[in-house]
Amino acid sequence: MTGGDIPRPLSDIERDVIARLLSVPFPGRDELRAQLPFATVEGRCDCGCVTVNLAVDRAAAPATVLSGAPVSADISDDEFYAGIVLLVDGEGYLCCLEVYSIGDEPVRRLPPVEQINARPQR
């Protein structure tokens, strides 16, 4: 789950997608938002999808969340349906932007944020 361009800063679209996920209220959201400027990409999925592993500088404060997957989203358009989950490690730091497909093909590009319907986990 690494490549020649890893580690690297978040791309604009990765940052925008995470910000969209963090736009819905849930416990720990504000702390996770504050981690975003400290987040970098440290790995990616080998299947070719756009899932990325994240690392956060520990200078940022950890978040207290109710689960390791505090927020998720549906992505849909006329051609496909998929999902996104923002994962948090056991120490309270962003650790993965997981993008999964409901179909056979992996999601190879992040969608426009307008197509992301975020919701907190219950």
Predicted regions and their residues:
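N-terminal domain-onset segments
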Residues: 1-72, 109-122
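Short, compact, well-ordered microdomains
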Residues: 76-122
